[in-house]
Curated annotation (Swiss-Prot):
SMART domains: AAA. Its EC number is 3.4.24.-. Homohexamer. Interacts with FloT at midcell. Interacts with FloA at midcell. Another study shows only minor colocalization with FloA or FloT. Keywords: ATP-binding, Cell cycle, Cell division, Cell membrane, Hydrolase, Membrane, Metal-binding, Metalloprotease, Nucleotide-binding, Protease, Stress response, Transmembrane, Transmembrane helix, Zinc. Acts as a processive, ATP-dependent zinc metallopeptidase for both cytoplasmic and membrane proteins. Plays a role in the quality control of integral membrane proteins. In vitro partially degrades Spo0E, the phosphatase that acts on Spo0A-P. Recognition requires the last 14 residues of Spo0E. Its stabile accumulation requires FlotA and Flot. May degrade EzrA. One of its GO terms (biological process) is sporulation. In the central section; belongs to the AAA ATPase family. In the C-terminal section; belongs to the peptidase M41 family. Changing K207N: Does not complement an ftsH deletion, loss of ATPase activity. The keyword Membrane applies. ATP binds at G201, P202, P203, G204, T205, G206, K207, T208. The gene is ftsH. Disruption phenotype: Required for expression of the stage 0 sporulation gene Spo0A, as well as for a normal heat or osmotic stress response, cells lacking this gene grow as long filaments and tend to lyse upon entry into stationary phase. Secretion of some extracellular proteins is also reduced. Loss of biofilm formation. This is ATP-dependent zinc metalloprotease FtsH.
Amino acid sequence: MNRVFRNTIFYLLILLVVIGVVSYFQTSNPKTENMSYSTFIKNLDDGKVDSVSVQPVRGVYEVKGQLKNYDKDQYFLTHVPEGKGADQIFNALKKTDVKVEPAQETSGWVTFLTTIIPFVIIFILFFFLLNQAQGGGSRVMNFGKSKAKLYTEEKKRVKFKDVAGADEEKQELVEVVEFLKDPRKFAELGARIPKGVLLVGPPGTGKTLLAKACAGEAGVPFFSISGSDFVEMFVGVGASRVRDLFENAKKNAPCLIFIDEIDAVGRQRGAGLGGGHDEREQTLNQLLVEMDGFSANEGIIIIAATNRADILDPALLRPGRFDRQITVDRPDVIGREAVLKVHARNKPLDETVNLKSIAMRTPGFSGADLENLLNEAALVAARQNKKKIDARDIDEATDRVIAGPAKKSRVISKKERNIVAYHEGGHTVIGLVLDEADMVHKVTIVPRGQAGGYAVMLPREDRYFQTKPELLDKIVGLLGGRVAEEIIFGEVSTGAHNDFQRATNIARRMVTEFGMSEKLGPLQFGQSQGGQVFLGRDFNNEQNYSDQIAYEIDQEIQRIIKECYERAKQILTENRDKLELIAQTLLKVETLDAEQIKHLIDHGTLPERNFSDDEKNDDVKVNILTKTEEKKDDTKE
């Protein structure tokens, strides 16, 4: 926006200057009429001449004057040759009362400027237009210059205190900070500080924030660049930018260089369909040389971030280059609470907001997810003109982050509403009965995003690995919705397609990756689906098992799904009263949280408090007998 404004102002100034110069010349040059010598003599004899000025110009006399009937800005101009003609005019002027005014001498500078100014204006305008066409300045010559941004200001530096939920990761980077502050301490002991630190982890876990905090704590210049900024369409530009980056870093040493998304330039050489990318490989080669080549780069530490460390070139990860890898994972419940406290500093929270409870309800959330959750809560509160963010705003924000905004205006038929209620009720009952299944933290039949309703099924605690019974119970929980539809309505709908997708994926990984098939044994088959595929490397990978094994894999997956389906059917049949109670309550209040579900199962009623903005507790009390009878009436209709 600023650049557009500056360009507009520049063009306006150029236009005003041109208009001013043209106006000046037009106003400074009065109307002049060329008059012949004979006519001038006749007018002079007739007494029509009022005033004249005579000025010698290049061998003639330039006579400029006004007739008595002329306007104020009207003049005549005639030229008189030297000699008798001039003497005749001078003698005639002496005999008349014509005013002879001294000639106005024009300064040489004025003449020069009036001649040169139009050319200067044209040149400046042409130069500016050429500048714009080239993208500014000597852009063609600057292709090889680094695009890294240098941060040296002391204000608004990120510190380690601004990074929460990554205590171990921060500790790993403390050595880097100490080296930048006091390198002699390490040199005296013969220690070599890591030249490169690679931050690996899922998106949104704070890799870039950790790098900024490292530079902020050390108080040194901080160069920031993205991996995609190196490679351009022109050959050799990437390598040139790498050289220029390290040249600038040497001038500002000690310093930090942060390369975000380094996999854009550091992926394996020679990989890719149709061969490698020569320009990218040339850039990578130059980066390898600069990091650990013949010329030492003392005082320069490189921090890079990626979420695809599996595709990086091995030469980039060897000791002497990125010889320290720090895994920045999603925070656990304690880390999530710490992250929430950091992002809640500038937000007024109501006393009903419990950050620890929010942390327990958000397993798997990254730091960016938690920041977005609190920001959404602030937006929800502001939309309702509240002064503080309360627990309801947090709940609404959590739902928006997980499933999208509520579609309260969507028109849903009574039949579809019943199907959704019993579908979500099936998930809920399975979560209540099975100890190893994911627990339902919230269930609703309010449409959100693409879903007609949803149940928030989360692990009971943070898990870093899962047992076979846990995985089987998870599949049973996913199938609970479809089974409930079949038991209650005797028919099934398309609402369970996502449940089937997730359940099938778990069963397939149990058989092909985790070795949990009794028939096939502890073997792994094919490409691990837990890791991401790199097409250039994995395209030509052949199937490492026979067609017979492939058939047996399919049979094992079907067996697991069928057994879990039958198990879910048995559980819901035995607990049909709970299914009816939860489904009918959902049809009345639309949304239930974990506390309400527990109280409903234990006492047959909802707890004595408001559950929605529209309904009071007295209006939503239900019991098993009443709701079962209502269901029978509905099915008769």
